[in-house]
Amino acid sequence: MKKYLFKPNSPIQDAFDRIIVMADGAHAFGAMRNGKKCGSVADFTNFSFHAVKNMTTAEGGAVTWRNHKGIDNEALYKQYMLLSLHGQTKDAFAKNHGTSWEYDVVDTQYKCNMPDVLGALGLAQLSRYDEILDKRHKMIDMYNEAFKDMNLQVLNHHDENSRSSGHLYFVRFLGKGAEFRNKFYHKMAENGVMCNVHFKPLPMLTAYKIKGFDITDYPNAYNMHKNQLTLPMNSKMSFDDAQYVIDTFKKVYAELTAEEN
């Protein structure tokens, strides 16, 4: 490698003396591999606490970073605070609990600070997140055991070296197409079980179609999408609820495959 090929454009990159590794941990809060949790591996990791996530603050998220020689953690934290509140040096709490009301706006930045009420919601969930995650994985085990002899493909959520965040439980109907999946979805809904599909490939969305993208150019994406279904799994469900999902799933599967034959 040529000397001086890497040219840092900020004091932070200069301290790292290399390209910074930033991870998208939006759905991965609590995931672990080889004893290391998501958020402790990359230099920076961004998490989402949107309403559909395992742990939610209704909206918002968090960023974590690893200790690194030459990085002042307190200064970096303050920089994030400036970025999220218009570049303002004091928030409302600090203005009313200090020795002076005086504040400054040192740069034109964003308005994306988390409201205190939502932060309190997150702290309450954080205190019991291990319990929430354990429950999700017990439901995953229930689903896995129930579907192991069926012609389905499921995502592996845990083994001896890793454990996912258990965010979604989805199945693929092997040898089936979109028509079967869509019928299955409606049959489950008729029995009181709301499923979902994750996710629709971008070339199938109008915003991308008008830019010239065509799903026929992405056969792998379509083949993964066409027969995929996501089953209910959340911390408010009971194990009896999960068993009802299983029983309904098997009943609907038997009905639809019988119709095909």
Tell me what each language-model feature is:
Residues M1-F16, M32, H68-N261:
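PLP-dependent aminotransferase class I/II
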Residues K2-M55, W101-V105:
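Conserved active-site segment immediately N-terminal to the catalytic lysine
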Residues G25-A28, G60, V117:
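Generic detector of well-ordered alpha-helical packing
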Residues G35-C38, G60-A62, V245-I246:
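Short, glycine/charged-enriched secondary-structure capping and boundary segments
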Residues C38-S40, V63-W65, F213-T216:
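Short, hinge-like loop/turn segments at secondary-structure boundaries
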Residues S40-A42, H50, T56-E59, S164-G166, ...:
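Short, solvent-exposed loop/turn segments at the edges of secondary structure
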Residues N46-F47, M55-T56, G61-T64, C112, ...:
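Short glycine- and hydrophobic/aromatic-rich loop-to-beta-strand nucleating segment
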